[in-house]
Design a protein with these regions (language model features):
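Intrinsically disordered, low-complexity regulatory segments in eukaryotic proteins
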Residues: 1-6
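Ligand-binding loop in jelly-roll beta-barrel domains
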Residues: 119-143
């Protein structure tokens, strides 16, 4: 069998292109305009496990893309967790009910509601159901 150098080159190029395509598939739909404006389809974001059972999240912008503000999606599933915020945070509830407990009081939000939590707040994030919300934090390097 006589295999030409050109055929080998074509095969190698095709394999490399297919491999690169598999490895570079975006995790979710995000469009970055040359102006710096970013559009994200939140319904395509798949959250990953975070710190404890029933808590998942996914940062949707990098520090390079948005150096001053962070943004992501968090999912809570019939759970609660405690934390003290070292950043300012806005939460926009997408699905379910988000409850923020502070000093024995509860601030609650449903789909379309926004909750602001100031830096230094010692709170419990909790939910009686499965909740999905977008978070917006300042500064961007919140973890």
């Amino acid at each position: 069998m006589n295999v030409s150098e050109e055929l080998i080159r074509e095969i190698v190029t095709k394999v490399l292109e297919e491999s690169a395509g598999k490895g570079s598939k975006p995790e979710f739909e995000k469009h970055i305009d040359p102006s710096g404006i970013i559009g994200i389809k939140t319904s395509t974001v798949k959250c990953e496990p975070f710190q404890q059972d029933g808590v998942k999240l996914k940062d949707v912008v990098t520090l390079e893309e948005a150096p001053r503000m962070g943004c992501g999606i968090m999912e809570l599933d019939h759970t609660s967790f405690e934390c003290t915020l070292t950043y300012d945070e806005y939460d926009l509830v997408l699905d379910g009910t988000l409850e923020i407990e502070i000093d024995g009081r509860v601030v609650s939000g449903g789909p379309g509601d926004i909750i602001y939590i100031p830096k230094g707040s010692h709170i419990h994030f909790q939910t009686p159901n499965r909740t999905r919300y977008a978070y917006f934090v300042y500064p961007a390097d919140w973890q």
